[in-house]
């Protein structure tokens, strides 16, 4: 605790108190002063020991208004590391992602160049070989970005990158593991179009509390640029024991505006009866002016609620 107090004093308040072994937004708290730090430290440490078997805690700078942007990298069999653009992941509840899109509406060509170069350097520094995600926080006022963590695996949201870059990341992982060259030209990677993923969860659309139950109706949307990844169908039981993700609704198109229009139609056509689900939330989000403008941050869901 004394080390945490010293670290926080050096960083400056407010700070984020984070479980070192945590993930998925679990094991995090914000401290605005030393008294709050002492409380949050004990709370996060106890949670981390109970959930992860490791009570180690990190103290980080906290940004009240920030965007969550991540870079998809791929460490190739020949030793090179390439970046396949960025994903915007700022629509979150309880620090867990609900929406991901690529390219990010917040990232200019100049910022993209810096962001991708930094992610590639991170991969090169550890001789990385595989698909991986370098996650960052982006200050929209200054365009400064700060390293969060690297996920050494595919992310739930990898399909949006696949659509925009025309690369099958699962296949490329297997090729790296087999010592084979990629199917694409690493020197000619360039984004084309836009893609958005909506995480359809079994949860109340207002407070996002778990909503298990038996699926009575399950009708997936179809249409140009519409894809649904799911393992559920009518008659299945959604239990409270696992992650609430029911499906990934992935929309692609030539422009962000086109994708948003397709997403509205797809959400309206997605019928799920039985367990509570967040489809109504997405219908609301897709009419929200802040989201439609692209000028949103990680606080957008709390402002909607």
Where are the regions that the model predicts?
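A conserved helix-loop-beta module that forms one wall/lid of the active-site cleft
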Residues: 1-27
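ATP-dependent carboxylate activation and anion-phosphoryl transfer catalytic cores
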Residues: 19, 24, 31-305
């Amino acid at each position: 605790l004394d080390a945490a107090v010293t670290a926080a004093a050096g960083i400056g308040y407010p700070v984020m108190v984070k479980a070192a072994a945590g993930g998925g937004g679990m094991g995090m708290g914000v401290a605005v002063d030393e008294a709050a730090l002492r409380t949050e430290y004990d709370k996060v440490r106890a949670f981390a020991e109970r959930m992860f078997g490791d009570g180690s805690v990190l103290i980080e700078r906290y940004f009240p208004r920030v965007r969550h942007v991540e870079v998809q990298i791929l460490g190739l069999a020949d030793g090179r590391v390439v970046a396949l653009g960025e994903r915007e992941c700022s629509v979150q509840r309880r620090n867990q992602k609900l929406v991901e899109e690529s390219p990010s509406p917040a990232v200019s060509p100049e910022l993209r160049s810096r962001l991708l170069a930094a992610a590639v350097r991170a991969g090169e520094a550890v001789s990385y070989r595989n698909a991986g995600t370098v996650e960052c926080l982006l200050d929209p006022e200054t365009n400064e970005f700060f390293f969060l963590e690297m996920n050494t695996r595919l992310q739930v949201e990898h399909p949006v990158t696949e659509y925009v870059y025309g690369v099958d990341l699962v296949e490329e992982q297997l090729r790296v593991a087999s010592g084979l060259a990629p199917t694409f030209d690493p020197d000619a990677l360039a984004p084309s179009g836009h893609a958005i993923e909506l995480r359809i969860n079994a949860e109340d659309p207002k407070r996002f509390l778990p909503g298990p139950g038996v699926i009575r109706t399950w009708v997936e949307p179809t249409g140009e640029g519409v894809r649904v990844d799911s393992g559920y169908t009518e008659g299945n039981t959604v239990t409270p024991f696992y992650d609430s993700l029911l499906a990934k609704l992935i929309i692609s198109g030539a422009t962000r505006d086109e994708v948003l229009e397709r997403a509205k139609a797809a959400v309206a056509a997605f019928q799920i009866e039985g367990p509570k689900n967040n489809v109504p939330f997405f219908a609301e989000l897709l009419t929200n002016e802040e989201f439609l403008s692209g000028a949103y941050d990680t606080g957008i869901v709390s402002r909607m609620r």
